[in-house]
């Protein structure tokens, strides 16, 4: 069975993306397509700013920080992703970019979609 991670890309307290992500997850859970959907809220992972000396591509999915390791395990368990992200200053929010940059191999070869 494939697993799709629905990633809420904003960490703001009243982020609209959380409402959208929860709605999408509810709709997806009702589908009979043989796909498992899991909601991954960046705010709950509380990922620290990337400052490690070992770049993620060389970390072999083993991270010193337990929060980054938990994030790695959650992302690695997924076969694809739907990113729910706002646009801040013509880009994604900093916490979303940081969360993406903290990992490397976990993303490789997996399809993505954006909302």
PLM feature segments, named:
Residues 1-85, 90-98, 102:
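N-terminal beta1-alpha1-beta2 submodule of the flavodoxin-like/Rossmannoid cofactor-binding fold
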